[in-house]
Amino acid sequence: MNAADLGNTIISAEDSTLEWDRAGTETAATGVEVIQAVVKRLPNAPGVYRMVNTEGDVLYVGKARSLKKRVTNYAQGRGHSNRIERMIRETATMEFVVTRTETEALLLEANLIKRLRPRFNVLMRDDKSFPYILLTGNHPAPGIFKHRGARSRRGDYFGPFASAGAVGRTINSLQRAFLLRTCTDSVFESRTRPCLLYQIKRCSGPCTREISVEDYATLVKEAKDFLSGRSSTVKAEIATAMQEASQALDFERAAIYRDRLAALSHVQSHQGINPQGLEEADVFAIHQEGGQTCIQVFFFRTGQNWGNRAYFPKADPALGHGEVLGSFLAQFYDDKPCPRLILLSHPVEDQDLLAEALSARAGRKVQVSVPARGEKKDLTDHALQNAREALGRRLAETSSQARLLEGLAETFGLEAAPRRIEVYDNSHIMGTNAVGAMIVAGPEGFVKNQYRKFNIRSAEITPGDDFGMMREVMQRRFARLIKEQGLPGNGSEAEDSDASFPAWPDLILIDGGQGQMSAVRQILDDLGIADLVTAIGVAKGVDRDAGRERFFMEGRPPFTLPPRDPVLYFVQRLRDEAHRFAIGSHRARRKKEMVKNPLDEIAGIGPGRKRALLHHFGTAKAVSRAAVEDLMEVGGISESIARLIYNHFHESG
């Protein structure tokens, strides 16, 4: 049973044969009474438990070797930290599931924490997917590509890389070394002569048979071997081939091998610190300071440093290095492949259990260790130094951000420094492909996982009507917010320091003047929340020069700020970020419209048939010229579908 299966077998206390006592959460004693009632019915077996409040929100997810013994600790009612006391006080009911082993419990716990994001657990933040290198496996001439997201495409994946830039640089060097194609399948099928990449020796030209199928397959195998960690073997084979070509006086071929070797050396030398004898490992280091935590991760694959990334998990300051790092690791590898070796700067709780769980997930042995000396210790020390520096920068930025937010509150007459600021902007060209954008900022800077874009879709909006677009954006944003979160102050958002990032904004900034503000105010009035949200319009001066902005607020005449006011610079940064995001979203939508395939307009042609047609004919234009009989030669295209396609392209003729 894997974590995904376990995640679907959660036993609710109300749905099981046990009758769970429900109690209020007004006092700490009430919470203890609920837990004491649950303990009587818990088995002495491994499993996972969930603590739930009166609203049905999961407060905490925990695992246990023995559910009964673990939950009994909460029933004592005394001797707990403030965090645990608050959690117990809010607990209205508990749910549990029994697992076969403690390893399964650990995997399930990590799965549930990532999915449910309980307020009292250690939580990963900024968990963007990592980019990988993909060698496609469903084509006679596999290509090499950058890939991010679900691994739905057949092929071999290599990574993770810390950034898209690292992937791009590596692919660029691998093109020089292995001459693999990077074109799409449709472009590959439509080529009649080699492209520029062939001319500059970045591709071997399999599209026009400039290389045999067998020789290209050899290049693909060498690339796989290199990316799989057998770089020394690959380089030795190429060096041998270069020597043989040189001895045969085939100096042109020897020069090709020489250039390939140089490209491989560039891949390995360009990645910074590259330890000897460490083919595949992840290095984690944790540093805690000022109530915050930084975990620095370095990725080593094929003996190369593929980059690093800093994480700042949400954790109770009272928790130690081991507990935070252990919880982080379980969540980190919940949806990522594990390397064979994981090096840590600090020991973690249940380290052997963690290694066992990761081994079970990977299907092979995964070693988790804290090196005490040697080159591996140097790696963890290097990662720890990076963690210290990253957290130092973050603390400095947070302090500066806090001062700016306090200044913002004073300037605009807010009751307190805003915890959540939303900034709105629109982008379009003559009303086409109109997009509304919302960016979010808070005490820790921009919160990019909260950004939202709104494709303007109302048929009643006149093209170019910025006020109408803003009304639609406001209506959709706040109507949905009310539906999902309720009104602010009704208890839907936790009020203690462990609360997650607030859903309701304390302040909204609109890129526009009085007209935009009137549109926004109309929607807020219609929804009955005009008194709950402070809205400010930010308009550029007559000459649209930065520094001459005019501000519009309800109940105040338009006003300006001194040119060198730090709050003015801060507002400009917020507005510019919203503008950047709006323009980027608009360009993406416009690009999507521009590359829209004519086959998308034919009813009955889904992704599978579209892919088969393009693979057979190469381009949509070639499909449009094909006869019915030619179309029927494509797998999955019946006579009726072939006539449908033919008629679509010839109906006006």
Curated annotation (Swiss-Prot):
GO terms for molecular function: DNA binding; excinuclease ABC activity. NCBIfam families: PRK00558.1-5 (NF001824), uvrC (TIGR00194). GO terms for cellular component: cytoplasm; excinuclease repair complex. The UvrABC repair system catalyzes the recognition and processing of DNA lesions. UvrC both incises the 5' and 3' sides of the lesion. The N-terminal half is responsible for the 3' incision and the C-terminal half is responsible for the 5' incision. It comes from Chelativorans sp. (strain BNC1). The keyword Repressor does not apply. This is UvrABC system protein C. Disulfide bonds: none annotated. The lineage of its organism: Bacteria, Pseudomonadati, Pseudomonadota, Alphaproteobacteria, Hyphomicrobiales. InterPro entries: GIY-YIG_endonuc, GIY-YIG_endonuc_sf, GIY-YIG_UvrC_Cho, Hlx-hairpin-Hlx_DNA-bd_motif, RuvA_2-like, UVR_dom, UVR_dom_sf, UvrABC_protein_C. Residues 44-122 form the GIY-YIG domain. GO terms for biological process: nucleotide-excision repair; SOS response. It is found in: Cytoplasm. It comes from the Bacteria. Interacts with UvrB in an incision complex. Keywords: Cytoplasm, DNA damage, DNA excision, DNA repair, Excision nuclease, SOS response. Transmembrane segments: none annotated. Residues 232-267 form the UVR domain. Belongs to the UvrC family.
